[in-house]
A protein has these predicted regions:
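Active-site-adjacent structural elements that line small-molecule/cofactor binding pockets in enzymes
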Residues: 1-289
Length: 289
């Protein structure tokens, strides 16, 4: 199992640059950025990195606000500018962002994502795309010379997981447990594509109290239909129930369970102070040994 890390809600681009350099010095396999509403652009951030792990990725880049031609152009530009190593993770996000904040109709995320990938993938591969569909009409070829990035897709529900297996190199998941990976995700995507799991952690000597606080902090996340359905499959009531809370041993044990469940890549996302993040990432040597 490959291990990488991400930085949750960085305050400044410099924080991302420093975190990626730290990940590289630690020998981690990957570093990931995320598109959060009103925050930094993940692809631009990756293009600014100096020292970095072998793989950098977006987990995820939102599809609805970006035309697939734009996404392909930006991704290939990052590949060319940085010497490769990009993994492009995309996904439809959620209605509260796409429709409520941006005013874009959140119509059939499954059909939209299928069509998006149908246009995006061949563009990344340097092909001329001629497509006329429900959401996009495209007749173009990109004059951008760069190796195609690996293509991942955010997926939790059964049909989205099956779509990821059909059209991408892997899935990106978050707010999941090892049991959800073993019983729901892995059986639907098989063993031929990657299963990338963002594992959110928190070092705490009072895990029950910490989980109660996180349940309040992440309450709105649990109301999003995709996450609510996924949590329901596992019999969980809150995204906080998926956070690994405890000491170093608890985190190492959780990583072992994710590996045994079929996870190919873990993206560690530590909560807490900078010192907590350092302690968490220091565990990688323990786990690897």
């Amino acid at each position: 199992m490959r291990i990488g890390t991400s930085l949750i809600n960085p305050a400044r681009p410099d924080d991302v640059v420093a975190a990626a350099a730290d990940a590289a010095r630690r020998g981690l396999d990957s570093f990931w950025t995320n598109q959060n509403p009103g925050r930094w652009d993940p692809l631009v951030l990756l293009a600014t990195l100096g020292e970095r792990p072998p793989e950098t990725g977006t987990a995820i880049l939102t599809t609805y606000p970006r035309h697939p031609v734009t996404t392909a152009t930006e991704a290939l530009t990052v590949q060319a500018a940085t010497g490769g190593g990009l993994t492009l993770g995309v996904g439809p996000s959620h209605a509260w962002y796409i429709q409520d904040q941006l005013g874009i109709p959140y119509t059939s995320p499954l059909r939209h994502t299928r069509e998006y990938l149908t246009v995006l993938r061949p563009l990344l591969n340097g092909e001329h795309v001629r497509h006329s569909g429900e959401f996009f009409t495209v007749d173009t070829k990109l004059d951008v010379t760069a190796p195609p990035p690996a293509l991942l897709m955010a997926a939790l529900g059964p049909r989205m997981l099956e779509l990821a297996r059909e059209l991408t190199d892997g899935v990106v998941t978050t707010w999941v447990t090892p049991e959800l990976i073993a019983e729901h995700v892995a059986p639907r995507v098989g063993t031929d594509i990657r299963i990338v799991v963002q594992v959110i952690t928190l070092l705490s000597t009072e895990p029950d109290r910490a989980r109660e606080a996180l349940a309040r902090d992440f309450g709105a996340v649990g109301e999003m239909p995709a996450y609510r359905a996924s949590l329901g499959r596992a019999g969980l009531s809150s995204p906080a129930d998926t956070v690994v809370i405890g000491d170093e041993t608890d985190i190492v044990n959780a990583l072992t369970r994710f590996r045994d469940a079929g996870t190919t890549d873990v993206v560690l996302s530590p909560l807490g102070t900078p010192a907590d993040r350092k302690r968490t990432l220091d565990l990688i040597d323990t786990f690897s040994s």
